[in-house]
């Protein structure tokens, strides 16, 4: 099965746009309500520890820092956005690109919280769905 070039270009635009929108929303929350922003350096630290065989941490913040972890984290954040968008476009058979509607994109976007809830947060030492954080409900709502 080949993926058409316009699917890929559409997914790149959607993925970057969605990631940028998420970053702007987090910036708004930080400046308006003093809610701490997501730290993509920690994502980079997690990824940079993987080649050494470490996939889970008791506390990602206590894990030794790695060179270029912030750069890796930010690149990964946008790459993950593009990959999620590409999966969405493929699942929608590309029809959604020709006639985009909010509901399928919104439902898919909500579904993507499975990744941070059940993979990233437990691997960072934060528990399933941020259950080991001081404010787990706030963390869950921010993931949406």
Regions found by a protein language model. Give the residues of each.
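Juxtamembrane/disordered regions of integral membrane proteins
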Residues: 1-144
């Amino acid at each position: 099965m080949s993926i058409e070039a316009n699917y890929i270009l559409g997914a790149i635009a959607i993925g970057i746009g969605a990631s940028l929108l998420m970053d702007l929303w987090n910036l708004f929350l930080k400046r308006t309500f003093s809610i701490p922003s997501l730290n993509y350096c920690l994502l980079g630290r997690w990824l940079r520890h993987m080649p050494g065989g470490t996939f889970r941490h008791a506390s990602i913040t206590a894990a030794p820092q790695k060179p270029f972890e912030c750069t890796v984290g930010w690149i990964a954040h946008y790459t993950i956005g593009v990959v999620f968008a590409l999966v969405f476009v493929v699942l929608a058979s590309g029809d959604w690109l020709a006639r985009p509607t909010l509901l399928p994109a919104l439902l898919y976007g909500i579904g993507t919280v499975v990744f941070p809830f059940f993979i990233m947060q437990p691997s960072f030492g934060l528990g399933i769905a941020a259950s080991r954080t001081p404010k787990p409900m706030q963390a869950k709502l921010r993931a949406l």
